[in-house]
Amino acid sequence: SIDTIINRQYAIANNQADSIDLPKQRIYAMCNLRGGIGKTTLSFNLSYLVDNLLAVDTCPQGNLSFFYDNNYYAAQQTNVKDMLLPYLVPGLGKATRVASYIGATNPYFSKKNNYYIPSSEELYLLPSQLITAINQTAGLQQVQKEQALKSILYSLKTEIERELAENNLDKCIIDTSPFFAGATQLAWYAADALVIPVRTDQQSIKSLELLI
């Protein structure tokens, strides 16, 4: 209930809260179906606190990418949409070593071995492309259909695992957008756990209930 969240927030603000012993995971997705709740801010702050980390920006607004490189949109570098497209459009070659070293464009990260995969404005098109790719599996035999769907739905996870291995990284944070379709859906398949930022107001609680 909202009272539980308010009481927890009050205890934290007054240094009276005990830490919660949560299981440690490898890939986290920052999720909430409400905008302006702090997903990107929390993703950025956590990426600064943790070393050997991969940050993946799946929000088409690209705010997290901007925090790492305020000129990323003009850099013409391979982005998360480019990385996912070969799983949706047959015949395209798969990318490799997509992630960029954050310290190269943000000096505050120069002492950390952290990388990021930038966003793309074209992620707004991903939901329809994802649905089209899924619909194309309808005519396949059951085994083939299951293999094709698994390849599509776990495409982001496959690419994250590859980037983690290629860059010798330990953890991953995925920043998501406030809508579920497209890259956020793939982020849920990729993640070992969801981190859900919640403010202590009724609208935020409603959004949490909707997400769950």
Where are these regions (language model features)?
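P-loop NTP-binding core
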Residues: S1-I212
